[in-house]
Amino acid sequence: MSQVADFGKPAPIFIITGGDPFERADIYELVRRGKELGLPMAVSPSGTPKLSRESLTKLKDAGASAISLSLDGASAEVHDGFRRVPGTFDRTITGWREARELGLRVQINSTVTKSTVHELPDLLRLVIELGAMTWSAFLLVPTGRGTELDALTPRETEDVLNFLYDAGTFAPVKTTEGHHFRRVVMEREVLADLGVDHVEALGLGSLYQDLAARLAEIGPVDRKRRPPLHVNAGNGFVFVSHVGTVHPSGFMPIAAGDVREQTLTDIYRESPLFLGLRDTSRLEGRCGKCEFAGICGGSRSRAYAVSGDPYGEEPLCPYEPGSFPYQHELALALPNMGNAR
């Protein structure tokens, strides 16, 4: 933890994940130590009986500022079926409410698959009703249990990312391993400025139209969209395993070093793997030719999982470089990407 603090200011967000962090008897001591070091502390608990008001109160008292909870369906039937554990939906909803009451910020993480994609509008309703600092849609990386799940096609993913852009006027929205969301945001901003219909211009399909129609039922909201952060594996993000090995992300099993042998700052700043992942000239395939490479870069974790090459093209992106029809307007807008409406 002291090595993370050595990154300096602004202090990195320190997230304790698992498994279930509440399985550690010293979880509160770890949070307290991180807080003493000046780190913003967050915890990602599982929807188990250990997710109680007592444990959340202890987290808050120890210095945690936020938690993240997984919610993949808007009903017990869907969520518990997806997680294969009865009772997780009710425990998660209760924990969400209690965390908010205690003053903890809550991020909701939703895995998007063929079996859960139609839950997205109803999940958004829950996010609006119960309140969350962020709703994060996770696009599958085929590792671990992710290899057993039905991932969306690239065109379906495009429909979902455009729905999430629309949802951004209702709640703070981000993606996990969906880096081409930044491309979609830029495309939509340019089209909106030109008054061009995005459905036709982007060739969006029936999945988008179904999700958008259900979104319209929620009612008009006009909040400022949260600009998507440019964070990717090894670029603004680092994962340290429970045994000390250092990885660009939790979904990329390549180790760049070990905190028991080198400092975390040295590994992040100097290892060939991390340096390579921050160099867009190393990107291959369509990603290497894409005009959006500087703001997107594709999921390096998914590229590695599918091809064995961390610099390979993004498998879930259907975009052909140079195909956006308003390239001049796009070139003018790209420098202002951080100011998305």
Annotate each language-model stretch with its function.
Residues 129, 133, 146-172, 227, ...:
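A structural motif corresponding to the C-terminal lobe/cap of the Radical SAM core domain
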Residues 1-18, 278-279, 313-341:
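Short Fe-S-cluster ligation motifs
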Residues 129, 240-241:
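Short, acidic, Ser/Thr-enriched surface-loop or helix-capping motifs
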Residues 1-18, 23-155:
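Radical SAM/AdoMet-radical enzyme domain recognition
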Residues 19, 72, 140, 178, ...:
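Flexible loop residues that form catalytic
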Residues 283-327:
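Cysteine-cluster motifs in flexible loop/terminal segments that predominantly coordinate metals
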Residues 231-235:
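Short, small/polar residue-rich loop motifs at catalytic or cofactor-binding pockets
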Residues 155-224, 245-297:
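C-terminal accessory region of radical SAM enzymes
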